[in-house]
């Protein structure tokens, strides 16, 4: 892979603190530096350096340092995005294990390698545009309570890929043995699993239906999507209506819902994940410990997670969403374009439309 330009992005800590009111955020002049380089045809190495004058930890989920086949970069060819064939994982930012964070002392660096051909088909070869953007939750000092976040956007780079070599890279996701597509996979969803998921789908259907109505005329649309455009309202309402319809199709929907980790992508702290390219949603063990219904606030319940995961699925509504941010405090800081493509903004709006 040849780089046409250097790829060095300095990331400043955004004044986004998840544990504080939005109008009373702690300020900081510290930051992070990320460098991405080629180490093979489609392999890349990311190096992140703590440029602050104090210790910090960053959440590795959905970053370059996530071991799972999550979306680490965006790839485009001939002006169109290359489809992403990996997973989108959902976690509760207020309930994460210590091992989900990577600590860095001042001046310390950490690096990770990954192969972009594991989650995208690059067998056509030729010239590709690579770029990345997102939000990295940060813990300042000891502990695991997220206190701020890094918002970053990299420069676009051009790379030349050997298509034949890229075609030899094995997909990061194992094949799962599945029956013909059904809404609920009865091989993994049995007994209490099936009953709990059926109730969650009913809850999610209610969330999505009320959100569709609120999207058309509600007064909190600007809060979550940073626009009041009638056309955007209509589009968001259409996504919610499609989600509600999917929730009401337990035996003939557009996705397959699994109650056990058939793709082996669960780990501690992960609640559920979606594989858009396979129209599959999978619940991880922590999902089954969530409350069935939450009546106020924005804490996740089983139905909330269903809305989040279904927002990812392009088989339900195109285009599917991604994960720029999680939780109310992060999500309401996104700009309109980011918010409209972020799964948790839809789940949060649905909660706001249904709860006290």
From Swiss-Prot:
Catalytic activity reported: Preferential cleavage of bonds with hydrophobic residues in P1'. Also 3-Asn-|-Gln-4 and 8-Gly-|-Ser-9 bonds in insulin B chain
Gene3D superfamilies: 2.60.40.2970, Collagenase (Catalytic Domain)
Leader sequence residues: 1-19
Coarse class of the protein's main subcellular location: secreted
Gene Ontology terms describing biological process: proteolysis
EC number(s) per entry: 3.4.24.39
Record InterPro entries: Fungal_M35_metalloproteases, Lys_MEP, MetalloPept_cat_dom_sf, Peptidase_M35
Listed cofactors: Zn(2+)
Keyword Hydrolase: yes
Active site: 309
Cofactor binding remark: Binds 1 zinc ion per subunit.
Protein name in UniProt: Neutral protease 2 homolog UREG_03761
């Amino acid at each position: 892979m040849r780089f046409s330009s250097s790829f060095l992005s300095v990331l400043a800590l955004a004044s986004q603190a998840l544990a504080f009111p939005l109008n009373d955020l702690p300020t900081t002049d510290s930051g992070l530096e990320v460098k991405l380089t080629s180490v093979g045809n489609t392999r890349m190495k990311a190096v992140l350096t703590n440029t602050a004058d104090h210790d910090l930890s960053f959440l590795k989920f959905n970053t370059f340092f996530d071991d799972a086949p999550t979306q680490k970069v965006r790839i485009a060819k001939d002006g169109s995005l290359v489809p992403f064939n990996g997973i989108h994982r959902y976690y509760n930012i207020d309930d994460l294990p210590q091992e989900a964070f990577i600590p860095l002392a001042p001046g310390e660096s950490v690096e990770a390698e990954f192969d972009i051909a594991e989650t995208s088909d690059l067998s056509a070869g030729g010239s590709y545009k690579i770029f990345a953007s997102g939000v990295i939750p940060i813990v300042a000092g000891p502990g695991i309570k997220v206190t701020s976040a890094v918002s970053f956007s990299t420069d676009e780079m051009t790379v030349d890929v050997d298509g034949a070599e890229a075609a030899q890279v094995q997909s990061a996701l194992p094949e799962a043995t599945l029956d013909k597509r059904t809404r609920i996979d009865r091989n993994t969803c049995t007994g209490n699993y099936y009953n709990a998921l059926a109730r969650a789908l009913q809850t999610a259907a209610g969330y999505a239906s009320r959100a569709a109505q609120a999207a058309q005329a509600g007064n909190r649309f600007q809060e979550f999507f940073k626009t009041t455009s009638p056309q955007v309202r209509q589009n968001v309402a259409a996504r919610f209506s499609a989600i509600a319809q999917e929730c009401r199709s337990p035996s003939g929907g557009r996705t397959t819902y699994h109650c056990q980790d058939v793709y082996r992508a669960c780990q501690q702290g992960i609640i559920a994940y979606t594989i858009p390219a396979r129209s599959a949603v999978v619940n991880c063990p922590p999902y089954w410990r969530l409350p069935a219904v939450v009546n106020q606030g924005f804490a996740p319940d089983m139905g909330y997670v269903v809305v989040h995961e279904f927002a990812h699925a392009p088989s339900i509504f195109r285009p599917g969403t991604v994960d720029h941010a999680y939780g109310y405090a992060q999500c309401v800081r996104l700009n309109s374009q980011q918010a409209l493509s972020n799964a948790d903004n839809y789940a949060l709006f649905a909660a706001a439309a249904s709860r006290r």
